[in-house]
From Swiss-Prot:
Source species: Escherichia fergusonii (strain ATCC 35469 / DSM 13698 / CCUG 18766 / IAM 14443 / JCM 21226 / LMG 7866 / NBRC 102419 / NCTC 12128 / CDC 0568-73)
Similarity annotation: Belongs to the ClpS family.
Protein name: ATP-dependent Clp protease adapter protein ClpS
Gene name of this polypeptide: clpS
InterPro entries given in the database record: ClpS, ClpS_core, Ribosomal_bL12_C/ClpS-like
Assembly information from the UniProt record: Binds to the N-terminal domain of the chaperone ClpA.
GO biological process: protein catabolic process; proteolysis
Highest taxon in the source lineage: Bacteria
Primary role: Involved in the modulation of the specificity of the ClpAP-mediated ATP-dependent protein degradation.
SUPFAM superfamilies: ClpS-like (SSF54736)
Pfam family, any one: ClpS
Length: 106
């Protein structure tokens, strides 16, 4: 008499689990979008506070946002990217600025 789980290939299930566990996570770009109202100093503050850039790099990125319309602040896993986007957008609203932070798949 056969067992009810003879049709299961436990070795294959284990291999599938290992392969899935070894897959790198999906990565997402966090992007700041230019607007005509947010002060440049505030954008620099955001880049330093939430992305740990020094003042020189934050200034370079702020100028990229200003002149090119947007800039990538970093590339992160989905959870980290979503958290950073929410934190930046909340901080901007708390300070009454329309600065927009978004994410897109890398």
């Amino acid at each position: 008499m056969s067992k009810t789980n003879d049709w299961l290939d436990f070795d294959q299930l284990a291999e599938d689990k290992v392969r899935d566990a070894l897959k790198p996570p999906s990565m997402y770009k966090v992007i700041l979008v230019n607007d005509d109202y947010t002060p440049m100093e505030f954008v620099i503050d955001v880049l330093q506070k939430f992305f740990s850039y020094d003042v020189e790099r934050a200034t370079q990125l702020m100028l990229t946002v200003h002149y090119q319309g947007k800039a990538i602040c970093g590339v992160f896993t989905a959870e980290v990217a979503e958290t950073k986007v929410a934190m930046v957008n909340n901080y901007a609203r708390e300070n009454e600025h329309p600065l927009l932070c978004t994410l897109e798949k890398a």
